[in-house]
Regions:
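Terminal, regulation- and interaction-focused segments at domain boundaries
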Residues: 1-19, 23-26
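N-terminal intrinsically disordered, cationic/polar leader segments
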Residues: 1-7, 35-37, 41-72
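A sequence-composition feature that detects small, non-aromatic residues
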Residues: 17-18, 25, 29, 45, ...
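Extracellular/virion structural assembly segments
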Residues: 23-30, 34-37, 41
């Protein structure tokens, strides 16, 4: 059973998506963690020095997706 799971999906420009990824990367590099704000809930997660990263690309005839998962 999950203690907490936050999920959000929204449409944005490619540039906005790149900015979001940069913000996450900067937070991981500088602050050793990430912070999420979702429906008035603020959650901070500490991230250890070593993590597992999974990158998955899927292309279909009508849609493609890129998933990046970081776990520890």
């Amino acid at each position: 059973m999950d203690l907490l799971e936050l999920s959000e999906k929204k449409t944005m420009s490619r540039e906005e998506a790149a900015d979001l990824l940069r913000q996450l990367a900067d937070s991981l590099a500088r602050h050793n963690g990430v912070e999420f704000n979702h429906n008035g809930i603020k959650v901070q997660a500490r991230v250890p020095d070593e993590v597992t990263v999974e990158v998955e690309f899927e292309a279909e005839s009508d849609e493609s997706s890129l998933e990046i998962e970081i776990s520890w």
